[in-house]
Amino acid sequence: MKVKNLHIIQEVIANISRFILAAAFIFSGFVKAVDPLGFQYKIQDYLAAFGMASWFPSFFPLLGGIALSAIEFSIGIFLFFGVRRTVASTLALMLMSFMTPLTLYLAIFNPVSDCGCFGDAWVLTNWETFIKNVLLLLAAIGAFKGRKMLVRFISQKMEWLVSLYTLFFVFTLSFYCLDRLPVLDFRPYKVGKNILEGMTMPEGAKPSVYESVFILEKNGEKKEFTLENYPDSTWTFVDTRTVLKEKGYEPAIHDFSMIELNTGEDITEDVLTDMGYTFLLVAHRIEEADDSNIDLINEVYDYSVEHGYKFYCLTSSPEEQIELWKDKTGAEYPFCQMDDITLKTMIRSNPGLMLIKNGTILNKCCLLYTSDAADD
């Protein structure tokens, strides 16, 4: 009787662990699959933070991200239905064994602001991510130890069909969202959102408190100082960084600032309060932007001029790259400079087109390929 009860307990633990893992892996894989460019940017952040960006070819972050999201989603589906139980539980344990110490390092040293494990759908701090991964690691151990006890919801004869359909679905989803735009937009710039409202601080909300830290050098020794203990002029300035002292409320949109290139004027408020239509061509790195739809872009600009609408190209690229773009494309539209991360967040396309009116986003379209641009 005791042996039977112990077996039942082990089976219950294994299956509870299996469903916890399945939910986490399905959600994590799905939200990254619908936003392959967003996951690419996160992988690029990781590689840059660890000084490994030059180790891999340029296509690695994108294709690697698509592959990893497909693996996560497939593991989750397999665990949920009891398909490929040994393979799924082993891969889950391997992934969690790797990710748990990695996220501990991220939590301690903070080389990236967040791990990106759930994309933009659910942003966790690095410490929250580590705690989550510890729990998932325990679940992975439980599912792996009891892998033979995982209840099947699909017969062994049908395992190949579930496996094939799962992989087909997740890869098709990723490449569709890459060709178009994410079918689910978890960012503050999705269609229907008002940018100005997203920048507004609620009444009574306490803002975050930051402190400037100055790195100075004297006699070959580097030290960090604040404004309160800033030393005399015998120290040489090396670098500066901003440190978060006290976390407060942070608006969903906090780095949206349009600086017109020709005048250096901040035109953000003028654009966001304009009651007419405004076209925003978003190209976070103009030198890397796809130019296959240049004729369409110029047609939209001509249309906006003809009807009295505003048209701006937003980029983080330096002026010399903008001039090269003008020479190559014949662009006559005005340019504004903006933060690179903000531009990547606005639209998952380089370039992409956004239509706003009175600060409200009316439409967005991808300009990487003719399919989306022509339809919109």
Regions found by a protein language model. Name each.
Residues 271-288:
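Short active-site neighborhood of thiol/selenol oxidoreductases, capturing the structured segment around
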Residues 11-34, 58-102, 143:
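Functionalized membrane-embedded alpha-helices
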Residues 97-150:
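Membrane-embedded alpha-helical segments of integral membrane proteins
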Residues 173-267:
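Membrane-interface segments at or immediately adjacent to transmembrane helices
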Residues 351-364:
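A short, hydrophobic beta-strand/beta-hairpin element that forms part of a small beta-sheet core
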Residues 369-375:
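Conserved small/polar residues in nucleotide/adenosyl-binding loops
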Residues 155-182:
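Internal/C-terminal transmembrane anchor helices
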Residues 26, 311-314, 328-350:
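Short, internal strand/loop/helix patches
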